[in-house]
């Protein structure tokens, strides 16, 4: 059973005052997300990512189509007890402390006072919020600190699936690494994570599958390795070598493009069956092989090509 199943989901907005017109924010989107995966949802500003999340959370309502989460139609309010959600720009009560906010969210899910206190302490520690700030009012928090509190509240009900809209927003490099580790640990626990992010390097490190949205329509979806394969030549390989200079290697190498780099020579070949010729040339010239791997386009290249 898919963790999330989206079928022909469409959302139109009316804009204008005197002369109203419809703008299609999401156009016939269909997706299926397996349980236990980290799924990356990408797109430029205005592509429809946040609209999709708001539709799944029932904060807004679709013009057409349907969706199911954990086997239940999104109209089934009981489903919300099993999910966690961090919006892109969360707003919290300024005069609550971090501890009070998380305990309040736990109370909404029916936890006892003892359970609420323990859950709040466990989660604030898990998101690595400095314990000295647990009883500080949220109005005194930085953007990154508020983001950590938002992550804590999204996990208060021990959800089976977590929806995160720009979870790295406002975090410094150390904070991003800690949140990446947290998200990876959720997958290790068997949870499903649906995350939107503009930070492509984080998506590349974390996600099992991705989808790219363009102007409200699905442009690409699939496993990262499959999407990053070069469409013009999916069998291209890269050999990194040291211990030999480019001029010497060119005298004996009959195929392959040689490029000097700080790490050594980068040799590109267009087919796997050409590797033996490269290895033979390196042995003949005294070179050493550092690595052999397929050449894949980066996620940034894939994103920009859409």
Give the residues covered by each predicted segment.
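Non-catalytic surface loops within mature trypsin-like serine protease
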Residues: 15, 35, 241-243, 271
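Short, surface-exposed acidic/glycine-rich loop or hinge patches that mediate macromolecular interfaces
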Residues: 73-74, 218, 242-244, 272, ...
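Active-site-adjacent beta-strand anchor residues
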Residues: 95, 239, 268, 292-293
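A short linear hydrophobic-aromatic micro-motif
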Residues: 177, 256-259, 288-293
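C-terminal coupling/interaction segments
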Residues: 270-306
